[in-house]
């Protein structure tokens, strides 16, 4: 029984030594690997391509709001950062010039030190990440092909022309549709159809009025009576 316990203790001790040895080996590899060190130092700043980004010196408002932001966040833990910034901006505007002056002096001192330390410094704002375009928003190839295949042809959309004026108007519309973009084809075709319908209706009304004015009134002939027999 004691031999079993001693063997179990020996196995546990061996496993513990192996774990400690692995931990030391991993830590040595992490410290001696330059890639790992570079990744730790430049984590979150991969856009600079390994160059240490120089921060701008803080202005008077940033110096004042540094402590005030922490105070407001502790007093209002549910408040978002954007709301805290709005509140701090309002409080900064309410301060007098005498209250702001110490922060302006400190900001000027920091700018002078920054200018001496980085004489060739130029402010380069970071580029905003462009949102990726969704493929669902782009027009599909089938819809583009369908728009290109839309034609204004008499075989597809036959029209009945009443006069030469309607024919010329439709010819001009065909030229305009052929030179315009495919998106406007449907609306132009609908306008042309409405124009032709109104023209045809107006022509038919004028023709009917002309016929009623030119033709004499027609009365049905009465049955022959004595007056018709003696007075033809």
Curated annotation (Swiss-Prot):
One of its GO terms (biological process) is sex differentiation. Keywords: Activator, Calmodulin-binding, Cytoplasm, Differentiation, DNA-binding, Nucleus, Repressor, Sexual differentiation, Transcription, Transcription regulation. Residues 117-141, 170-189 are annotated as: Disordered. SUPFAM superfamilies: HMG-box. The keyword Cell inner membrane does not apply. One of its GO terms (cellular component) is nucleus. GO terms for molecular function: calmodulin binding; DNA-binding transcription activator activity, RNA polymerase II-specific; RNA polymerase II cis-regulatory region sequence-specific DNA binding. Residues 176-189 have a biased composition (Polar residues). Pfam families: HMG_box. The keyword Ligase does not apply. Residues 54-122 bind DNA. It is found in: Nucleus speckle; Cytoplasm; Nucleus. Transcriptional regulator that controls a genetic switch in male development. It is necessary and sufficient for initiating male sex determination by directing the development of supporting cell precursors (pre-Sertoli cells) as Sertoli rather than granulosa cells. Involved in different aspects of gene regulation including promoter activation or repression. Binds to the DNA consensus sequence 5'-[AT]AACAA[AT]-3'. SRY HMG box recognizes DNA by partial intercalation in the minor groove and promotes DNA bending. Also involved in pre-mRNA splicing. Belongs to the SRY family. This is Sex-determining region Y protein. It comes from Ursus arctos. The gene is SRY.
């Amino acid at each position: 029984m004691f031999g079993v316990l001693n063997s179990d203790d020996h196995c546990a001790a061996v496993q513990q030594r192996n774990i400690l040895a692995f931990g030391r080996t991993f830590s040595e590899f992490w410290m001696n690997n330059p890639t790992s060190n570079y990744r730790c130092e430049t984590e979150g700043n991969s856009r600079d391509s390994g160059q240490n980004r120089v921060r701008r010196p803080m202005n008077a408002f940033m110096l004042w709001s540094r402590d005030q932001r922490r105070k407001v966040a502790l007093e209002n833990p549910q408040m978002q950062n954007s709301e805290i910034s709005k509140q701090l901006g309002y409080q900064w505007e309410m301060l007098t010039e005498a209250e702001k002056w110490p922060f302006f002096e400190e900001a000027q001192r920091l700018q002078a030190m920054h200018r001496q330390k980085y004489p060739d410094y130029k402010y380069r704002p970071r580029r905003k990440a462009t949102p990726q375009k969704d493929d669902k928003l782009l027009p599909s190839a089938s819809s583009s092909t369908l728009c290109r295949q839309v034609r204004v042809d008499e075989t597809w959309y036959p029209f009945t022309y009443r006069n030469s004026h309607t024919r010329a108007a439709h010819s001009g519309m065909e030229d305009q549709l052929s030179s315009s973009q495919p998106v406007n084809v449907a609306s132009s075709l609908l306008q042309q159809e409405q124009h032709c319908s109104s023209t045809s209706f107006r022509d038919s009304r004028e023709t009917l009025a002309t016929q009623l004015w030119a033709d004499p009134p027609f009365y049905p002939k009465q049955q022959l009576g004595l007056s018709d027999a003696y007075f033809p």
